[in-house]
Protein backbone atom coordinates (compact mmCIF):
# COMPACT_ATOMS: atom_id res chain seq x y z
CA UNK A 1 0.00 0.00 0.00
CA UNK A 2 1.37 3.44 -0.97
CA UNK A 3 2.18 6.01 1.67
CA UNK A 4 -0.94 8.05 2.44
CA UNK A 5 -2.97 5.62 0.42
CA UNK A 6 -5.70 3.12 0.96
CA UNK A 7 -6.31 -0.28 -0.59
CA UNK A 8 -7.38 0.02 -4.19
CA UNK A 9 -5.05 2.91 -5.01
CA UNK A 10 -7.00 5.74 -3.32
CA UNK A 11 -4.53 8.38 -2.13
CA UNK A 12 -5.86 10.99 0.30
CA UNK A 13 -2.80 13.21 -0.17
CA UNK A 14 -3.46 13.50 -3.91
CA UNK A 15 -7.11 14.26 -3.25
CA UNK A 16 -6.22 17.05 -0.79
CA UNK A 17 -3.71 18.48 -3.26
CA UNK A 18 -6.32 18.49 -6.04
CA UNK A 19 -8.88 20.16 -3.77
CA UNK A 20 -6.40 22.89 -2.84
CA UNK A 21 -5.55 23.46 -6.50
CA UNK A 22 -9.25 23.72 -7.37
CA UNK A 23 -9.75 26.18 -4.52
CA UNK A 24 -6.95 28.39 -5.88
CA UNK A 25 -8.42 28.25 -9.39
CA UNK A 26 -11.86 29.19 -8.07
CA UNK A 27 -10.45 32.17 -6.18
CA UNK A 28 -8.65 33.36 -9.32
CA UNK A 29 -11.81 32.90 -11.37
CA UNK A 30 -13.86 34.89 -8.84
CA UNK A 31 -11.42 37.78 -9.18
CA UNK A 32 -11.60 37.59 -12.97
CA UNK A 33 -15.40 37.50 -12.91
CA UNK A 34 -15.45 40.80 -11.01
CA UNK A 35 -13.96 42.39 -14.12
CA UNK A 36 -16.35 40.74 -16.59
CA UNK A 37 -19.78 42.13 -17.35
CA UNK A 38 -22.89 40.94 -19.14
CA UNK A 39 -25.75 43.04 -20.38
CA UNK A 40 -29.38 42.69 -21.25
CA UNK A 41 -31.88 44.99 -22.89
CA UNK A 42 -35.64 45.36 -22.84
CA UNK A 43 -38.09 47.28 -24.95
CA UNK A 44 -36.02 46.97 -28.10
CA UNK A 45 -32.96 48.42 -26.41
CA UNK A 46 -34.78 51.24 -24.63
CA UNK A 47 -33.51 49.96 -21.26
CA UNK A 48 -30.11 48.33 -20.79
CA UNK A 49 -28.87 46.69 -17.58
CA UNK A 50 -25.27 45.61 -16.98
CA UNK A 51 -24.23 43.14 -14.27
CA UNK A 52 -20.84 41.81 -13.23
CA UNK A 53 -19.69 38.29 -12.47
CA UNK A 54 -20.73 38.62 -8.83
CA UNK A 55 -24.33 39.14 -9.92
CA UNK A 56 -24.19 42.82 -8.98
CA UNK A 57 -25.90 45.40 -11.11
CA UNK A 58 -23.27 47.89 -12.27
CA UNK A 59 -25.29 50.18 -14.54
CA UNK A 60 -28.67 50.90 -16.02
CA UNK A 61 -29.24 53.00 -19.11
CA UNK A 62 -32.70 54.32 -19.96
CA UNK A 63 -33.42 55.93 -23.29
CA UNK A 64 -35.19 59.25 -22.60
CA UNK A 65 -37.77 58.40 -25.28
CA UNK A 66 -39.22 55.68 -23.05
CA UNK A 67 -39.77 58.03 -20.10
CA UNK A 68 -43.43 58.99 -19.90
CA UNK A 69 -44.65 60.50 -16.64
CA UNK A 70 -48.15 59.27 -17.46
CA UNK A 71 -46.97 55.67 -17.96
CA UNK A 72 -44.39 54.93 -15.27
CA UNK A 73 -45.57 51.32 -15.06
CA UNK A 74 -44.20 50.50 -18.52
CA UNK A 75 -40.80 51.90 -17.61
CA UNK A 76 -40.80 49.92 -14.37
CA UNK A 77 -41.60 46.73 -16.30
CA UNK A 78 -38.80 47.39 -18.79
CA UNK A 79 -36.27 48.04 -16.01
CA UNK A 80 -37.30 44.85 -14.20
CA UNK A 81 -37.07 42.81 -17.39
CA UNK A 82 -33.61 44.14 -18.26
CA UNK A 83 -32.25 43.72 -14.72
CA UNK A 84 -33.60 40.19 -14.32
CA UNK A 85 -32.18 39.12 -17.68
CA UNK A 86 -28.79 40.68 -16.88
CA UNK A 87 -28.68 38.75 -13.61
CA UNK A 88 -29.62 35.52 -15.42
CA UNK A 89 -26.87 36.21 -17.95
CA UNK A 90 -24.39 36.72 -15.10
CA UNK A 91 -25.48 33.41 -13.55
CA UNK A 92 -24.94 31.64 -16.89
CA UNK A 93 -21.48 33.21 -17.25
CA UNK A 94 -20.54 32.09 -13.73
CA UNK A 95 -21.83 28.55 -14.35
CA UNK A 96 -19.88 28.35 -17.59
CA UNK A 97 -16.64 29.48 -15.93
CA UNK A 98 -17.18 27.13 -12.98
CA UNK A 99 -17.72 24.17 -15.30
CA UNK A 100 -14.25 24.78 -16.76
CA UNK A 101 -12.73 24.32 -13.30
CA UNK A 102 -14.96 21.67 -11.77
CA UNK A 103 -15.41 19.59 -14.90
CA UNK A 104 -19.15 20.11 -14.70
CA UNK A 105 -19.51 19.01 -11.08
CA UNK A 106 -22.15 21.02 -9.27
CA UNK A 107 -20.56 22.11 -5.99
CA UNK A 108 -23.15 23.99 -3.93
CA UNK A 109 -22.22 27.18 -2.13
CA UNK A 110 -19.35 28.31 -4.35
CA UNK A 111 -21.25 31.41 -5.46
Curated annotation (Swiss-Prot):
Keywords: Cytoplasm, DNA-binding. It is found in: Cytoplasm, Nucleoid. Its main location: cytoplasm. GO terms for molecular function: DNA binding. GO terms for cellular component: bacterial nucleoid; cytosol. InterPro entries: YbaB-like_sf, YbaB/EbfC. Gene3D superfamilies: Nucleoid-associated protein YbaB-like domain (3.30.1310.10). Transmembrane segments: none annotated. It holds the Pfam family YbaB_DNA_bd. NCBIfam families: DNA_YbaB_EbfC (TIGR00103). Belongs to the YbaB/EbfC family. Homodimer. PANTHER family: NUCLEOID-ASSOCIATED PROTEIN YBAB (PTHR33449:SF1). Binds to DNA and alters its conformation. May be involved in regulation of gene expression, nucleoid organization and DNA protection. This is Nucleoid-associated protein Teth39_2199. It comes from Thermoanaerobacter pseudethanolicus (strain ATCC 33223 / 39E) (Clostridium thermohydrosulfuricum).
